[in-house]
From Swiss-Prot:
Native organism taxonomy: Bacteria, Pseudomonadati, Pseudomonadota, Alphaproteobacteria, Hyphomicrobiales
Single biological process term from Gene Ontology: ribosome biogenesis
Molecular function per GO: ribosomal small subunit binding
Name of encoding gene: rbfA
A GO CC term attached to the entry: cytosol
Described purpose of this protein according to its UniProt entry: One of several proteins that assist in the late maturation steps of the functional core of the 30S ribosomal subunit. Associates with free 30S ribosomal subunits (but not with 30S subunits that are part of 70S ribosomes or polysomes). Required for efficient processing of 16S rRNA. May interact with the 5'-terminal helix region of 16S rRNA.
Principal cellular location given in the protein's record: cytoplasm
Keywords: Cytoplasm, Ribosome biogenesis
Protein name from the UniProt record: Ribosome-binding factor A
Localization terms from the record: Cytoplasm
Family that this chain belongs to: Belongs to the RbfA family.
């Protein structure tokens, strides 16, 4: 009876090496396209859009592209503009990244920056500051 091996994702949940490599190629291509201003959309003019991450599906046919407008403003407008230009962007990515199939693209706001800011604010609260400033040696003496 043949064994069926199930591929496990890496510990970070990023997928296989191939998914990570292709995702990085797509990220570079998309960042280059957006930086060159090749997308002619009034809603994108005046916005600098960063592409911090691209996640590929296991079959490499879907690319989830995480974007963040510089300054974090107008995220909904930028996502809508990118979605309107999805066909053009998919074609440009296909020209720049050598794959058997051009991946379908979908755009999401990268919320990691907001989460990092939230954690930073928590660390600055008085209660946490008090805990951080507490002498670690005094805790050890109390435990003994």
């Amino acid at each position: 009876m043949p064994r069926h091996h199930q591929k496990k994702s890496s510990a970070s949940g990023g997928g296989s090496q191939r998914q990570l490599r292709v995702g990085e190629q797509v990220r570079h291509a998309m960042a280059e396209i957006l930086a060159q201003g090749n997308v002619h959309d009034a809603d994108l003019e005046g916005h600098i859009v960063t592409v911090p991450e691209v996640r590929m599906s296991p079959d490499l046919k879907l690319a989830t592209i995480y974007v963040m407008p510089l300054g974090g403003r107008d995220t909904e407008i930028v996502i809508a503009a990118l979605e309107r230009n999805k066909k053009f962007l998919r074609g440009e990515v296909a020209r720049r990244v050598n794959l058997k199939f051009a991946p379908d693209v979908r755009f999401r706001v990268d919320e990691r920056f907001d989460e990092a800011e939230r954690i930073e604010k928590l660390l600055r609260t008085p209660a946490v500051q008090k805990d951080l400033e507490q002498d670690p040696d005094s805790d050890r003496e109390e435990e003994q």
